[in-house]
């Protein structure tokens, strides 16, 4: 694997902790913190695995390596590296130790500084490597390492902190507080509330966020238009691209925020922006051209492919279109709203998200309670 520069550890002795970290959790931190404090040189953390391992598509080895590095980025006593069994040709455990340790020894020489022996003769510089002490939660790993001349300590991680990665993967919300921050974004249950204009989406999203004490995003496009003093028919390709980037970054920031305890509500996303762009590009009174729409559509599709929605509540057109002096009233009729709705349905289907969609046809309170019941079920699993 490729490694960026990390400041080498220095000291007489370093600890070593290795694991798949799918995800990194408090139980792992117990081991790492002990290794860091019991050895003056700190701790080397090795993220292990192979392509298609227990991390699956959600947590492939390269992503786990990145997130573990992110978690320890401000800790000078922890050096994070990774070993991909497939890349080094290591056989499945227990037969792959020789190849695995050969790779580790190469990493070790990058991860630590040599200790030099003071000598009055500057031409005779002598040095030695820091000692190593391994920490593992599997008795077989400890025995194997000792047989190969390494120092190793067996830790009972479940004794003080009864958590394991399997428990988190099976029920992340129940074990949310045990998941380290970089990995939480992967387990967040993300709920999108979408539809055409004036269907109560923004109020619904805000009320749900407050009800569940969960982070929620606003519709970035509306704030952008207020700040830029621009109206719907003036929007061009650059504006729509700004909508796409702004909404994506806003949603991503909230999903990754410390305020997220497992549930996130979004008021809009790239599929909604694409809906408006496609519709307005066909209207000669609007600034957006068909050629610009192609560029917007490509960007929207690329962003949609990067987003993960666990449930999408689609509000069908109903009721009276409210004139808030910001919406484009030329498209306020039921015919126009249904045309927009059909475009959004198409976008949801073509993006592969239709199986996550629940269509809401009730009044505001009925829609609110439908989502509340769903979220309660998710939290009770």
Residue ranges and their predicted role:
Residues 242-307:
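Glycine-rich phosphate-binding loop used to anchor ATP phosphates in small-molecule kinases
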Residues 193:
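Hydrophobic anchor at the beta1->P-loop junction of P-loop NTPases
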């Amino acid at each position: 694997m490729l490694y960026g520069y990390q400041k080498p550890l220095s000291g007489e002795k370093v600890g070593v902790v290795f694991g798949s970290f799918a995800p990194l959790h408090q139980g792992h931190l117990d081991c790492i913190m002990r290794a860091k404090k019991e050895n003056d040189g700190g701790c080397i953390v090795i993220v292990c695995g192979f392509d298609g391992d227990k991390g699956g598509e959600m947590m492939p080895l390269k992503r786990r390596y990145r997130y573990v590095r992110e978690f320890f980025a401000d800790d000078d006593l922890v050096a994070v590296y990774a070993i991909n069994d497939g890349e080094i040709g290591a056989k499945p455990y227990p037969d792959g130790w020789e190849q695995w340790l050969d790779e580790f020894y190469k990493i070790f020489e990058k991860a630590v500084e040599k200790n030099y022996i003071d000598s009055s003769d500057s031409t005779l510089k002598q040095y030695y490597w820091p000692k190593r002490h391994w920490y593992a939660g599997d008795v077989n790993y400890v025995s194997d390492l000792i047989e190969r001349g390494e120092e190793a300590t067996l830790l009972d991680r479940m004794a003080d902190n009864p958590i394991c990665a399997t428990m988190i993967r099976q029920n992340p919300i129940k074990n949310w507080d045990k998941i380290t921050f970089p990995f939480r974004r992967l387990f967040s249950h993300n709920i999108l509330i979408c539809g055409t204009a004036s269907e109560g989406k923004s109020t619904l999203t805000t009320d749900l966020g407050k009800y569940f004490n969960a982070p929620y995003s606003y519709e970035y496009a509306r704030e952008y238009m207020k700040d830029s003093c621009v109206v719907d028919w003036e929007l061009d390709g650059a504006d729509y691209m700004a909508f796409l980037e702004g909404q994506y970054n806003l949603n991503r920031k909230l999903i990754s925020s410390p305020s997220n305890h497992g549930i996130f509500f979004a008021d809009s996303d790239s599929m909604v922006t694409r809906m408006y762009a496609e519709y307005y590009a066909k209207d000669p009174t609007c600034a957006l051209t068909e050629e610009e729409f192609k560029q917007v559509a490509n960007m929207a599709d690329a962003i949609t492919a990067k987003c993960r929605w666990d449930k999408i509540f689609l509000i069908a057109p109903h009721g009276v279109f409210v004139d808030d002096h910001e919406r484009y009233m030329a498209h306020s009729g039921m015919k126009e709203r249904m045309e927009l709705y059909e475009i959004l349905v198409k976008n949801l289907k073509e993006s592969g998200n239709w199986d996550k969609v629940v269509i809401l046809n009730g009044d505001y309170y009925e829609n609110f309670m439908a989502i509340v019941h769903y979220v309660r079920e998710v939290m009770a699993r």
